[in-house]
Amino acid sequence: LSTATAPAVKKAVPPAVYVLAAGVFAMVTSEFTVAGLMPQLAEGLVTGIPQIGYLVTIFAVAMAVGGPLLTFALLKVPPKSALMTIFAIFLVGNVIAALATGYPMMVLARIISGAASQAFFGIAVSMGVQLVDERVRGRAVAVVMNGLMLGTLLGLPLAIFVGGRFGWQTAFWTISAITLGAAVLTLAFVSNPAAPAGGVEPAASTRSDLAVLREPQFLLALASSTLIIGATFSAFSFFTPILTEVTGFSVSLVPVLLLVYGAATLVGNLVVGRLADKHTISTLLFGTALNALFLTGFALFTGVPSLALAFMLGIGLVGVTMNPAMAVRIQRAGSTAPLVNTIHGSFITLGVIIGSAVGSALIPLHGLRAPVVLGIGLAVLAIAAISPALASPYLRRGAPDDASEGERESGPVPPACPS
């Protein structure tokens, strides 16, 4: 009787997972604040808009490179203690940003904050999925990723409003306060996941985590995540100039349009979170195919306001919202370990860099529609990288409902995923 009822209890996502989303909210708000306060930062730091733009790239590179290094350094630390350490590092980065009197000081602040945020994402996702039954991991990831969606939807406008009204320094002080609040909630309500039966030595665990880098299905999962996010950010990075210079919306209306886009990502994230566990690969394929379709429509009809807006909302529904399904695929092809999830996060960040950097390079040559066309190509490549996973029942659907607890929690993977 107990074995029949235990899994049902664990199907609920515990409050601790929602608390982890609060930390993600703080990190994402900080990540995008620089892009929203470029003119104020350029004036305050006595530099130009292009130099402030480089701060966005610096943050992304710090995430991609520094995040895994910081996670690796914290592997022997219990997950909750690791999160509290990261909160402290992230807080230092934002305080330095608030106190910055020149560009070099701000560069240092963004490097510290970027590395901390990526490490936090990886460990938070890892903890979130370890606190629930394997069959609802996608739902748990969606809850954690709600912090990302809400950071874009609410945190970024809040930081821009505060920074615009009271000075850009106040935006970073506000983020610091949010960080402290999230840290207190984590300290109070988040516990370390139960250790796996039999225990694993840290060195052996690290070797196992790194060994997945030789697994073809894991590498394909990394590639598809990079391409999915790259496709989305090829368009998202340039929504503002496209909507104002090509579509013809007023500059004052763009924040409202982006708010609606953010609401679409929130809805999409919730839907994908529900589908990600039982229909992992089909969700990725269908969602990415829709994204390619919406990107195509956006590229063709940017001059028609109603259609451009409709296709933009479509991109919001099926773009970054693939995160829960992407995470479930990565965990099945690899493991739920923090280092694995942080490496995955770094490849997602690589997608952001590819979409925005290559898109920027194409604009002088082919115009503002060119990055969107790039996104279409990346989405098609993503479909090609997702398709081989259809051969694995475990990657498609996970463990069967009648699998034992030991089978569900035994870790990485499936006989159907040969190396």
Predicted regions and their residues:
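C-terminal transmembrane helical hairpin of 12-TM major facilitator-type secondary transporters
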Residues: 282-326
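Paired small-residue
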Residues: 93-96, 104-113, 306-314
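Helix-breaking motifs and short loop linkers at transmembrane-helix boundaries and internal kinks
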Residues: 46, 78, 99-105, 116, ...
